[in-house]
Curated annotation (Swiss-Prot):
Cofactor binding mode and count: Binds 1 [4Fe-4S] cluster per subunit. The cluster is coordinated with 3 cysteines and an exchangeable S-adenosyl-L-methionine.
Stretches of the chain forming a coiled coil according to its record: none
Residues binding substrate, per UniProt: N80, M109, Y139, H175, S195, R196, G197, D236, S237, L238, R239, E275, Y302
Organism superkingdom: Bacteria
Pfam families: ThiC_Rad_SAM (PF01964)
Protein name per its UniProtKB record: Phosphomethylpyrimidine synthase
EC number from the UniProt entry: 4.1.99.17
Native source species: Prochlorococcus marinus subsp. pastoris (strain CCMP1986 / NIES-2087 / MED4)
Catalysed reaction, written as an equation: 5-amino-1-(5-phospho-beta-D-ribosyl)imidazole + S-adenosyl-L-methionine = 4-amino-2-methyl-5-(phosphooxymethyl)pyrimidine + CO + 5'-deoxyadenosine + formate + L-methionine + 3 H(+)
GO biological process terms held by the UniProt record: thiamine biosynthetic process; thiamine diphosphate biosynthetic process
Record family assignment: Belongs to the ThiC family.
Cofactors demanded by this protein: [4Fe-4S] cluster
Residues that coordinate or bind [4Fe-4S] cluster: C423, C426, C431
Taxonomic lineage from the root: Bacteria, Bacillati, Cyanobacteriota, Cyanophyceae, Synechococcales
Free-text function comment from the UniProt entry: Catalyzes the synthesis of the hydroxymethylpyrimidine phosphate (HMP-P) moiety of thiamine from aminoimidazole ribotide (AIR) in a radical S-adenosyl-L-methionine (SAM)-dependent reaction.
Length: 456
């Protein structure tokens, strides 16, 4: 779809959506996004130029269907997939991608760390994906050095970053906000550094006693990104890994640096979103969202969860969806899903499904709470179908039609019950919606009550 859009841009020094927007040009991607979001193209252009909205769309990802992440657009959901040294198969990861897109993932991150050829699995995922693909390049940088922090050089990091751009990755998590002077602030935490990328860079800085190379070479990374229109997802290396560590000095020190880097990327006209926690008590979620908006000049916020309790292994998709709904309500632009396997193991296909549905609920609830135009239309349509006992319509409008039908059919599987005015909860004689009271009856009652009031 995008081939004809991209061809005229070849050879230009800066082909980012932000660069076009700042120059008053509405791209085909902006027009496409405007139709999907039911917003004026001029507003999309203005928000991209301002940095409040991004369209992750690498020019080498030609089969991409552009989408928007930002406060002006609907709240989005990301799904993480990826092979590990202990569980790996390219075909399985491609199937996870397809399942994620089926159940509504707006973007997908390939977090593969080993066990397969990382280039091959990434290329297979990008080839099959119509949604933006994100990666964390430091994983492959470490793998390319055979797991040796000592052998990793600054150029190794940049080489992998450009390789990901060349392959069509739409956004990359760049852990540039973690500075060597932040590391002592981790003392006193219960869980220390829980970001894999952050942990790699912390070890690199400690070994070499040098500043974070992704920070010192940040302008070089911007030069790479502007050639491909790759978007920054600025990683939060010091995100809290438990409630005890939330909103501490380490997290907030890095956030301040992320704000500085956001504005530096904008001077290059490179798009940015900023990643956030993590594990946060409910009473601190609003503070975290507002603080990010303040420090990062309203760049789109992209949070993992956050989990609102630490005692829910096996059910972390529920704990985190509670926090995600609140974060979305307060203005977070994209929610990174958490699966039931979080903290326990690599998610399988069913875990991907469970996590995504939980997060589609959270994002949708946030859109309703933020009074986005049309956000509640589907809810109202389903409610009408429920009141009219239109079971097939209810299934169709559900976030997970297959699961809704499965649960209904466990007790009433015959086709005749698709027209029944009851379910197995109340049975045929006790459903309150079965005894409908007409509007005429209610009007008549209201008239009688009015007369009674008048006569008193």
């Amino acid at each position: 779809m995008r081939n004809s859009w991209i061809q005229p841009r070849i050879g230009q020094k800066n082909i980012t959506q932000m660069n076009f927007a700042k120059n008053g040009h509405i791209t085909e991607e902006m027009n496409y996004v405007a139709k999907k979001e039911n917003l004026p193209p001029s507003l999309i252009m203005e928000e991209v130029a301002r940095g409040r909205l991004i369209i992750p769309a690498n020019v080498n990802h030609v089969n991409l269907e552009p989408m928007a992440i930002g406060i002006a657009s609907k709240c989005k959901v990301n799904a993480n997939i990826g092979a590990s040294p202990n569980a790996s198969d390219i075909n399985e990861e491609v199937e996870k991608l397809k399942l994620a897109v089926k159940y509504g993932a707006d973007t997908v991150m390939d977090l593969s760390t080993g066990g397969v050829n990382l280039d091959e699995v990434r290329q297979a995922i990008i080839k099959e994906s119509s949604v933006p693909i994100g990666t964390v390049p430091v994983y492959q940088a470490l793998e390319s050095a055979h797991g040796s922090i000592e052998r990793l050089t600054e150029d190794d990091f940049l080489h992998i970053i450009e390789k990901h751009c060349q392959q069509g990755v739409d956004y990359q998590t760049i852990h540039a906000g973690l500075l060597i002077e932040h590391l002592p602030k981790v003392k006193g935490r219960i869980t220390g550094i829980v970001s894999r990328g952050g942990g790699i860079l912390a070890q690199w800085m400690l070994h070499h006693f040098k500043q974070n190379p992704l920070y010192t070479r940040f302008d070089d990374i911007c030069e790479i990104f502007k050639k491909y229109d790759c978007t920054f997802s600025l990683g939060d290396s010091l995100r809290p890994g438990c409630l005890h560590d939330a909103s501490d000095d380490a997290q907030l020190a890095e956030l301040k640096t992320l704000g500085e880097l956001t504005r530096r990327a904008w001077t290059h006209n490179v798009q940015v979103m900023v990643e956030g926690p993590g594990h946060v008590p409910m009473d601190q979620i609003e503070f975290n969202v507002r603080k990010q908006m303040e420090e990062c000049s309203e760049a789109p916020f992209y949070v993992l969860g956050p989990l609102v309790t630490d005692i829910s292994p096996g059910y972390d998709h529920i704990s985190s969806a509670i926090g995600a709904a609140m974060a979305g309500w307060y203005g977070t632009a994209m929610l990174c899903y958490v699966t039931p396997k979080e903290h326990l193991g690599l998610p399988n296909a069913e875990d991907v499904r469970e996590g995504l549905i939980a997060y589609k609920i959270a994002a949708h609830a946030a859109d309703i709470a933020r009074h986005r135009a049309g956000a509640r239309d589907r809810d109202d349509e389903l409610s009408h179908a429920r009141y009219n006992f239109d079971w097939n319509k209810q299934f169709e409008l559900s976030l997970d039609p297959e699961r809704a039908k499965q649960y209904h059919d466990e007790t009433l599987p015959e086709e005749i019950f698709k027209k029944a005015e009851f379910c197995s909860m109340c049975g045929p004689n006790h459903c309150p919606m079965n005894s409908k009271i007409s509007d005429e009856t209610l009007d008549e009652l209201n008239n009688k009550l009015t007369k009674c009031d008048t006569s008193v």
